[in-house]
A protein has these predicted regions:
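Outer-membrane beta-barrel proteins and related beta-barrel translocases across Gram-negative bacteria
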Residues: 1-230
Length: 230
């Protein structure tokens, strides 16, 4: 299954600034243009995968600024239980282990009318990818207590790195350099929680208008840890 949609509204800032005649007065007053083209497809075989590609553009004809995403990519895979057979009950810590995968990729440009689709525009582009794999499981302990464990692994790929230097007293700014080249870094976190459900009933007597009130309490405790990568 795939879908495609497009809405394109692109123009020259010079044309819109020079549109003083009555026929184009609406164009002159409307100083923002935007476009979007998207394609999505679902691959149904197990595990199913969703893919979407989007190209977008936003333009201000007064300031001549243009922001583009060319393209934005999203990939997501359905949740998998690697230790449980499909269609069978998932009981216990091992059979309940599950994970999925997602990918986000963006290619962004911040440019102007003058540099539109020029080498300068492409040289200033920013490209990055983020891979995410959340893993979790849940199970019963002591018969009435539910426990869950989860962790998430994230890895970022980038093709430009900004290196900051000491404060420059002459310019009054922190000097920075943009270094071209592939780099990557990973982050992860871990969490766990314990919880149970307690039921109780207050009886007031059968001769009362309100004979009983049933209450439910769900106490829980959780802990999360994210290591520092400074």
């Amino acid at each position: 299954l795939s879908t495609f949609s497009a809405s394109v509204n692109l123009g020259s800032s010079t044309y819109y600034r020079n549109s003083y005649n009555q026929q184009n007065s609406a164009n002159f007053l409307n100083n923002t243009l935007s476009s979007s083209i998207s394609y999505s497809r679902t691959f149904p075989s197990y595990p199913s995968v969703n893919l979407s590609l989007t190209a977008s553009h936003s333009q201000n004809t007064n300031t001549q600024s243009i922001q583009m995403t060319l393209p934005a990519m999203r990939v997501s895979m359905e949740r998998i239980y690697p230790f449980a057979k499909e269609g069978t009950p998932k009981k216990g810590m091992i059979k309940n282990i599950n994970f999925n995968y997602s990918l986000q990729g963006d290619n962004r440009y911040d440019t102007s009318d003058r540099d539109f689709f020029s080498k300068k525009m492409f040289d200033k582009g920013q490209t990055g990818f983020r891979h995410s794999i959340p893993i979790s499981t849940n199970f019963k302990i002591l018969k009435f207590v539910s426990m869950s464990l989860n962790t998430s692994l994230d890895e970022v790929w980038q093709f430009k790195t900004v290196k900051y230097h000491d404060y420059d007293e002459l310019t009054g700014k922190v000097r920075k350099d943009t270094i071209n080249g592939f780099s990557r870094y990973m982050t992860y976190n871990f969490g766990t929680s314990l919880g149970t459900t307690i039921y109780g009933t207050f009886n007031f007597g059968k001769d009362k208008k309100i004979q009983a009130i049933r209450h439910v309490m769900r106490p829980s405790v959780s802990y999360g840890y994210t290591p520092s990568f400074d």
